[in-house]
UniProtKB/Swiss-Prot annotation:
Keywords, sorted A to Z: Aspartyl protease, Endonuclease, Hydrolase, Metal-binding, Nuclease, Nucleotidyltransferase, Protease, RNA-directed DNA polymerase, Transferase, Transposable element, Zinc, Zinc-finger
Keyword Zinc attached: yes
SUPFAM superfamilies associated with the record: DNA/RNA polymerases
Gene designation per UniProt: pol
Record domain Reverse transcriptase: where: 384-660
Species name: Drosophila melanogaster (Fruit fly)
A biological process from GO: proteolysis
UniProt zinc finger (C2H2-type) residues: 61-84
Protein name: Retrovirus-related Pol polyprotein from type-2 retrotransposable element R2DM
């Protein structure tokens, strides 16, 4: 190679012709080797600004947005993409002069042409040009001449000929009871309808039940009389009798409103802290989850408005008139829904029990009292209600309570109304909802309230559509819609009409109509209750049947959307993703998205719902394949006359709890979410064990959804784990060199059980991706390859030392092995053989104070401040025992050998013996403590001899060091007493002819049981699991007593911690 010299110190530049960022030419990037210059182009730098000694400065490319300069256009492009993506979109955007026809536009124009032709319009080209304003008449004319377009016309006409006629399904006025009585029908002239047949089957089932043998308070004979006379008395009279019967077995109690006396004003800070601690502990005892969430969310500043404000507002919302009719196509189902309205079985009752923690309705029937009803009685009650097609008057009324949507809720609209009907109504509606849900062929685009991971399905679909559009430079237009008060505004007429359209049984439709038109509610607030009224619209949030009814209406909406409009993903088209009222629309063109918006708005207005245009937004991605890029363009979309906001590339938005931008999922930082909550948990008046419980069961699981479906880097997960471990060490006062594995290993293996997000997050993502079900994208190669790539990436993140941690047990085993390999955690190796002994670590029981729990954890991990522990790594310092023993001062030495702690060791041993003795006496055994057995081998004194049913059980207790196998120590103890001379002496002394068995209660000084020892004692009925847990705590306390005694006698009278 030849070196060339250039004057004035200038560096030669190689010129390129660029595409994509600034050049509008379509030529490829070609290096021009012959164009070697020594000064910049005149077009870029004027001559009067050029100086020979400033060539290095003049060769840099400046950024027009922030003024920063770069050495090359490539560097400027990287800078623009990372720092100014919105400005880069403006720079890249090009105007289409002769854009290609997309498949979506062809379908829309073909459908419009069929519509215009059917209406007898002439001059079709000019008419179509009005609707397709961005196309010229000549372009429309040429497209209509193409063969593929003509095929679409024929296909649409064929579909129109085969499609059923659209029927106006108007809700007619129901005939009154007198009008129904005057209608004369005879079985000879009128065929039996399915409704009558199902009623006969239900009544036949009621009569076929065998007599119930139960307590007299359930009045089985009175209920049987109601059933026997039902066909004679009629449904109204039967309902009245059933209502009186329910009042008899469930006396009206109502809901108690307890008024708490406000605490007196504290005199000082100490008394204020004590009052706060008392309030938190009282709430903790009532409901741990609610107490923890209230502490994590910070100060609840929500204030419910007064009754004078809440009642008029919500009464107006619930009683506003809604549309009385709904028009649409009748949905053709593959199978009948008659099973929904059939006799209830005992299996249905067991599967639909109301949770014991659920609140009672206005009738005062609690879930516990409902479960006490014999199944035979409950079956008769439920099936009688089915036969009558209506609820008894005593359980029709519901109460409506309000829960704040945010911690700053102060206006009536900031609260969510929750309906609380009777427990019996909830159980019956849960059965009907389960039957209806399993009988409907749901549209695959609706994933809410279904037995599937709908959040994962829809969030991943949105991510797939966005990333696929950018990867293949395809246009995509997305609209995220917000339905205003969807559950509170749905028209009742649309519910009845939709049920009929889906082929629901007449009895079920009548039941729903009767419960909505005849069931009232009262609004309940802070110490007040309004008068009863009947809502005219909306579904009852809190009722098990309401989500299914709402889903049916939204499912009907999805079926009305044009199938040819949507974002193309491989060989499939998807145009919507719905999760209850959270609706996202996709289209390939701007006009297509506007058509979907118009269709959605028309349907929602019919069913009484409205879109909140201010909370809706659109994302417009324009593909530019020639430039090999996509740009975000702000297009105008309308909901009625209101324009929807359009987002830019950098704008973030949330869908189903996951943050997105126009390019896909946004990288999240869980440390930012969990940091403030960890601080609140630190300041909260809780014990250390309560803080750990809150962290393990509530705070960390709150991150799982975002970590599993969002985007997060491994480094961020490690930093979050580090932050969590910092607070754990702070709460427990642990030294910094405590093994990391001790924090993350499960309690059953000896650790604290704090989940490690570094491993749990990829595992959860892999699990949720594996459970994704896309029925409409099953055969789609693009969707399948996208899912497989995401799952493989999650698997790669779960690779640890040639092992794949694909499940939670694998992760727990990984941390347990790392704990046992550490010096301080090796003594916990045998802790995994028996789980209940670790209950005090994972559950915040009242057995231990906060101080005792902290000391117990330090004892467990060998973190007590002995000389060997505090001088670790500094061998030149003195490490001998302070009591003068010829041994290093280790925790094991103090607990097991040092003479200063001998008295406490004896007390620790006796405490275990006394606990076992008490449990044996409670089981009816005769227990002798330390009997003296004079045998040939000498004097033997086992700790306990238990006599039961002419059998003898000998139990000896030992607390051993943790350096050896405890199972071997257990077996040595048994062999110590299981000898012929001792057996002979036992039979002679206690005159027992039965079997003689020898056992040991073997633990180490950390409170860990020998697996063989504790399992044998429990299997023989000599020890309960609860007692084994208590003994483990007592051993731990006794070991702490040994250490305190040693430190006290060593001159440490102050607190050694």
């Amino acid at each position: 190679f030849e070196r060339k010299n250039f004057s004035d110190g200038l560096v030669p530049q190689r010129k390129f012709i660029h595409i994509g960022t600034t050049s509008t030419n379509n030529e490829p990037r070609i290096p021009l080797h012959n164009l070697m210059t020594t000064r910049p182009s005149v077009d870029i730098f004027p001559e009067d600004q050029y100086e020979p000694n400033a060539a290095a400065t003049l060769s840099r490319v400046p950024c027009t947005v922030c003024g920063r300069s770069f050495n090359s256009k490539r560097g400027l492009g990287v800078h623009m993409r990372s720092r100014h993506p919105d400005e880069l979109d403006e720079e890249r955007r090009r105007v289409d002069i002769k854009a290609r026809w997309s498949d979506e536009e062809k379908w829309m124009m073909a459908r419009k042409e069929v519509e215009l032709t059917a209406n007898g319009c002439k001059h079709i080209n000019k008419q179509l040009a009005v609707y397709f304003a961005n196309r010229s008449v000549e372009a429309i004319k040429k497209l209509r001449q193409r063969g593929d377009y003509k095929e679409k016309i024929e296909q649409i006409r064929g579909q129109s000929a085969l499609a059923p006629e659209v029927a106006n399904l108007t809700i007619r006025r129901r005939p009154s009871r007198s009008e129904q009585d005057h209608q004369v029908t005879t079985s000879e002239t009128t065929p039996i309808t399915p409704f009558e047949q199902s009623n006969r089957e239900i009544l036949r089932t009621l009569r076929g039940y065998s007599p119930v043998e139960c307590h007299s308070k359930w009045r089985a004979q009175e209920l049987q009389t109601i059933i026997d006379r039902a066909h004679l008395e009629g449904k109204e009279t039967t309902l009245q009798c059933l209502s009186l019967y329910l009042l008899g077995i469930f006396p009206a109690q109502g809901v108690r409103h307890t008024l708490t006396r406000p605490p007196r004003r504290p005199r000082n800070r100490r008394e204020s802290r004590r009052q706060q601690y008392a309030v938190v502990q009282r709430n903790w005892d009532k409901h741990k989850g609610r107490c923890i969430k209230s502490l994590l969310n910070g100060t609840d500043e929500s204030v419910m408005p007064s009754q004078e404000i809440m009642v008029p507002y919500w009464r107006e919302v619930m009683t506003q008139p809604s549309p009385s009719s709904c028009s649409g196509e009748v949905i053709q189902m593959d199978h009948s829904l008659e099973r929904v309205w059939s006799a209830i079985t005992e299996q249905d009752l067991r599967a639909s029990r109301v949770s014991l923690s659920s609140s009672p309705g206005p009738d005062g029937i609690t879930p516990k009292s409902a479960r006490e009803v014999p199944s035979g009685i409950m079956l008769r009650i439920m099936n009688l209600i089915l036969w009558c097609g209506n609820l008894p008057h005593s359980i029709r009324l519901a109460r409506t309570v309000f829960i704040p949507k945010t911690v700053t809720a102060k206006r009536p609209q900031d609260f969510r109304p929750i309906s609380v009907p009777s427990v019996l109504v909830r159980q019956l509606n849960a059965i009907l909802a389960t039957r209806l849900n399993s009988s409907i062929n749901w549209d695959p685009r609706q994933r809410g309230f279904l037995p599937t991971d709908g959040c994962a399905d829809n969030a991943t679909i949105v991510d797939l559509v966005l990333r696929h559009s950018h990867k293949h430079f395809r246009s995509c237009y997305i609209a995220n819609l917000d339905v205003s008060k969807a559950f509170d505004s749905l028209s009742h007429a649309s519910i009845y009409d939709t049920l009929r359209a889906y082929g629901a049984p007449k009895g079920f439709v009548d039941y729903v109509q009767n419960t909505y038109e005849g069931g009232g509610t009262s609004l309940n607030g802070d110490g007040w209750s309004s008068e009863e009224f009947v809502p005219a619209r909306g579904v009852k949030q809190g009722d098990p049947l309401s989500p299914i009814l709402f889903n049916l209406v939204m499912d009907r909406l999805l079926r009305t959307l044009p199938s040819e409009i949507g974002a193309k993903v491989g060989n499939a088209i998807t145009n919507a993703a719905a999760f209850a009222d959270d609706l996202v629309l996709f289209a390939e063109t701007r006009m297509g998205l506007q058509v979907l918006l118009d269709k959605t708005l028309d349907f929602l207005s019919i069913v009484g719902l409205k879109l909140n245009a201010d909370k809706c937004f659109t994302v417009g991605i324009k593909g530019q394949p020639k430039q090999k890029c996509t740009v975000l363009e702000a297009q105008s979309f309308y909901v009625g006359s209101s324009e929807i906001p359009s987002l830019k590339r950098t704008d973030e938005w949330k869908y189903l709890g996951i943050n997105f931008t126009a390019t896909g999922r946004v990288r999240c930082n869980p440390a930012e979410d969990i940091g403030p909550k960890l601080q609140r948990l630190t300041k909260a008046p809780l014990k250390p064990q309560q803080r750990l419980f809150a962290l393990r069961t509530v705070l960390i699981p709150q991150l799982y959804h975002k970590l599993a479906l969002g985007s997060v880097a491994i480094g961020v997960l490690r930093k979050t784990d580090k932050l969590i471990r910092y607070y754990v060490r702070r709460w427990l006062n642990l030294p910094l060199d405590v093994p990391i594995a001790f924090v993350h290993a499960p309690p059953k293996s000896g650790g604290l059980g704090i989940p490690s997000l570094r491993w749990v997050a990829p595992m959860l993502r892999l699990r949720r991706l594996s459970n994704i079900k896309w029925p409409h994208l099953t055969q789609n190669e693009v969707a399948s390859s996208f899912l497989e790539a995401e799952k493989q990436r999650a698997r790669d993140r779960l690779l640890a030392e040639q092992n794949e941690l694909l499940s939670r047990p694998a992760i727990e085993k990984y941390w347990a092995n790392k704990l046992y390999l550490s010096v301080d955690g090796s003594g916990l190796r045998e802790g995994g053989h028996y789980g209940p002994q670790h209950g005090w670590v994972s559950q915040p029981t009242r057995l231990l104070t906060g101080k005792e729990y902290m000391d117990g954890i330090r004892l467990r991990i060998n973190a007590l401040p002995t000389k060997s522990r505090t001088t670790r790594g500094r061998h030149e310092l003195e490490r001998q025992c302070r009591a003068g023993c010829d041994a290093p001062e280790t925790t094991n030495h103090i607990m097991q050998k040092c003479y200063r702690s001998h008295g406490r060791r004896v007390a620790r041993h006796n405490c275990v013996v006394n606990r076992i003795k008490r449990g044996l006496e409670e089981r009816g055994c005769v227990v002798i403590v330390e009997p003296s057995l004079q045998c040939e081998s000498g004097l033997n004194k086992p700790d306990l001899v238990a006599l039961r049913q002419n059998h003898i059980d000998v139990i000896d207790t030992q607390i051993v060091t943790d350096g050896h196998s405890m199972d071997d120590a257990h077996q040595r103890k048994i062999n110590r007493y299981d000898r012929p001379d001792i057996r002979t002496e036992l039979r002679r002394r206690f005159e027992a002819a039965g079997d003689i068995e020898f056992h040991s209660a073997t633990l180490n000084w950390r409170g860990i049981w020998s697996g063989q020892s504790v399992k044998r004692l429990i299997a023989k009925g000599l020890l309960s699991k609860y007692d084994s847990h208590i003994i483990s705590v007592q051993v731990m306390r006794g070991s702490l007593g040994c250490f305190k005694q040693f430190m006290y006698l060593s001159g440490f009278s102050r607190d050694w911690t």
